[in-house]
């Protein structure tokens, strides 16, 4: 993963870590600077001194929760997908007080967030380090479709989607489905959840990709949360993701979904479950897992291929650059 450090809007450093492969595609998140003044919400990383005096790379996710409230999540080792040890997680809380700096407090640290960096002290007021702001971008964002792909949506009118509604900016709104039916495939999806800081749970930027109209890969603003089986990246109500790879809302994110349909014999009896592998922002979050049956409000399982749906759950989730390769 390559991610770019921001300091007052300037790129000042880059880091590179590993990549991964999905069905022949090279996948790895990459970061890019965005212009303008950032909010406090976002991702930060840097070296902090731990209680034993040793330096440790540390990540921090700052989550807007509405009405001036903020949640901070300190992650030992780094950000999700970038060296976090997937074990140690410390929460901090704070409230905007009308000053340029947001102050968060946890049982062990105080964090002063100015939107570009975070000054961290222990409970005695001693400095333990500074975290810099990073903006991460999935390296699969903007991936062009291969020659064998069917382009579902590329920014304009399309005959491959039914009930497609397109914004003046050329983005796809929720509530459409493919005109064709599909059996086994690899699917590329780019999506963006809205900023809804006061919303909670399933009311916070909800949509979903319904494979064959039967199995939902959930889309939700789950940034900074401990993933449950109905959060972003989950196989809805069946399995949470291995790792919460959600970026902040209003950030473009990607799914790569490698899907194999359930198998049935000539008598219509099920002989094998549907299986899939999912990458979220380039990181594998499900590896060849079995689906026990349809998810949520999905259509009943059967041998027939069916369309892919992009769920309308009432929130303004947006899509772009959708394409599929049949297997």
Can you name each region flagged by the protein language model?
Residues 1-17, 23:
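Bacterial N-terminal signal peptides that target proteins for export
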Residues 15, 33-35, 242-245:
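Alpha-helical interaction segments
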Residues 18-19, 46, 72, 94:
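Small side chains
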Residues 19-21, 30-31:
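Cleavable N-terminal signal peptides
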Residues 27-30, 35-67, 160-169:
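Short, solvent-exposed loop/hinge segments that bridge or flank secondary-structure elements
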Residues 54, 63-68, 73-327:
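Carbohydrate-interacting regions of secretory-pathway proteins
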